[in-house]
């Protein structure tokens, strides 16, 4: 094997499996206190579909099974404003304090972006200050609109000014728009298409008001694979010169606004969607999001595996998407993975051709069990030489020496070693040095 082939294998395989270190930036905390508030006003179905059951225990169980280290919690839709600003402020305060308590109870597992009682801007600023400066919130969550007040509305500028002073992360999420007529937004569930339109509407309104240029230290996370923005932004940019020349709009810096946006992959991140998203952003601004608990855990498991297998095809490093981009965005809230202590081994094995099939079964089993049950085993991949199928290569990647030593003492490794002893004709270890993910990606993915 040449060095370039080894690098390619490590990029497409090693980065496709990150053991228990992933970050989910799109998931929801739905405490009983929030549900009680909705029920008191008959608003449980305001978004057109039932709000799922949630508990911290079930959320942690999902995270453990999915290999998610950290989840960033936000309040779901609807926005808890029922005509009384004080009541809304109280609901948001209780939510934020419960989220802060959960973060404290499970260090490193939960972060949270605070709920704000919009459309009351003064109360929203007060709650943002309390959440960020006292509770230790990791950002804020803003609805696409609150009672028709959309992101980008000049009335929100004082709040944006404060958030900018805190260099805040803003997670946005679509909410039910005001209906044009009695049937337009209720004919089909909002999540089917109107949520995508709603997000696009809100973000374009921010761009049209140059919000992220005027407040350049804000970082805004756009949900659901960018919604319709990859299609809407080219049209917006194309029409902008005409609109400004006619006096309908002020000149804005579209590219600078877009550069402040981050995009989560909650929803359906198909090949076409990924390709489209990459026309408006760069890989370092793409993040993993599950939309748990609105999407059931079993469905998420299948979707996530499918996503992992496709990312490299688009020049995307799964380590960046699932972990490192979020760590850079949220800073100290998420630990950045270290590469220096990794152990990387490449074994070249000559197998008895008559026993090859049996050997491959052993190798496949030990690889699957090891990566599923041992957090320190980052990768264990078996490959056959195309010209000489009985020549097998095994790429082994361990978090550190301790993880390697623990691995070779496991029952499943001993089963593999003893079971294949008479199948292996020779074994040669190729010494390697682990590369940083970024340089490895540049070397191999072209």
What are these regions (language model features)?
Residues 49-54, 80-81, 90, 117-124, ...:
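Acidic-and-aromatic substrate-binding clefts and catalytic sites of carbohydrate-active enzymes
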Residues 26-30, 173, 224, 407:
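Histidine-centered divalent metal-coordination motifs
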Residues 7-17:
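Bacterial N-terminal signal peptides
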Residues 335-392, 397-414, 425-446:
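Short S/T/G/P-rich N-terminal loop/turn motif that feeds into the first structured element of a domain
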Residues 29, 118, 174-178, 293-295, ...:
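Short glycine-enriched loops at secondary-structure junctions
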Residues 133-287:
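Catalytic pocket-lining loop regions of alpha/beta-barrel enzymes
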Residues 2-4, 23-25, 30-70, 97-105, ...:
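Mid-to-C-terminal alpha-helical segments outside catalytic/metal-binding sites
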Residues 44-85, 109-117, 138-142:
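Divalent metal-dependent hydrolysis catalytic cores, especially in the metallo-beta-lactamase
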């Amino acid at each position: 094997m040449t060095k370039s082939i080894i690098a390619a294998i490590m990029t497409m395989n090693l980065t496709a499996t990150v053991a228990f270190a992933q970050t989910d930036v799109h998931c929801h905390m739905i405490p009983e206190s929030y549900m009680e508030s909705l029920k008191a006003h008959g608003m449980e179905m305001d978004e057109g579909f039932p709000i799922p059951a949630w508990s911290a225990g079930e959320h942690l169980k999902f995270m453990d099974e999915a290999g998610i280290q950290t989840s960033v919690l936000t309040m779901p839709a609807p926005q808890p404003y029922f005509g009384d600003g004080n009541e809304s402020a109280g609901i948001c305060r209780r939510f934020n304090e419960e989220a802060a308590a959960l973060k404290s109870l499970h260090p490193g597992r939960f972060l949270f972006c605070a709920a704000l009682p919009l459309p009351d801007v003064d109360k929203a600023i007060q709650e943002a200050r309390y959440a960020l400066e006292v509770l230790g919130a990791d950002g804020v969550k803003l609805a696409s609109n609150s009672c028709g007040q959309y992101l980008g509305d000049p009335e929100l500028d004082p709040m944006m000014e404060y958030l900018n002073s805190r260099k805040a992360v803003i997670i946005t999420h679509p909410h039910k728009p005001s209906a044009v007529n009695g049937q337009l937004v209720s004919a089909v569930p909002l999540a089917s298409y109107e949520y995508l339109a709603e997000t696009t509407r809100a973000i374009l309104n921010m761009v049209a008001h140059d919000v992220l240029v005027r407040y350049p230290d804000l970082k805004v996370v756009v949900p659901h694979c960018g919604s319709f923005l990859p299609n809407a932004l080219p049209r917006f940019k194309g029409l902008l010169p005409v609109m400004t020349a006619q006096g309908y709009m002020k000149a804005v810096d579209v590219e600078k606004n877009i550069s402040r946006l981050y995009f989560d992959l909650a929803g359906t991140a198909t090949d076409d969607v990924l390709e489209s998203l990459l026309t408006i952003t760069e890989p370092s601004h793409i993040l993993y999001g599950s939309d748990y608990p609105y999407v059931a855990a079993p469905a998420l498991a299948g979707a996530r595996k499918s996503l992992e297998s496709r990312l490299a095809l688009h020049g995307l490093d799964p380590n960046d998407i699932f972990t490192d981009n979020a760590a850079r965005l949220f800073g100290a809230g998420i630990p950045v993975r270290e590469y220096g202590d990794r152990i990387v081994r490449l074994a070249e094995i000559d197998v008895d051709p008559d026993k090859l099939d049996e050997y491959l079964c052993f190798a496949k089993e030990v690889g699957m069990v090891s990566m599923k049950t041992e957090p320190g085993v980052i990768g264990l991949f078996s490959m056959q030489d195309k010209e000489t199928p009985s020549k097998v290569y095994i790429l082994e990647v361990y978090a550190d020496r301790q993880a390697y030593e623990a691995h070779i003492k496991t029952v499943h490794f001993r089963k593999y070693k003893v079971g294949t002893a008479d199948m292996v004709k020779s074994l040669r270890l190729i010494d390697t040095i682990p590369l940083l993910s970024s340089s490895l990606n540049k070397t191999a993915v072209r």
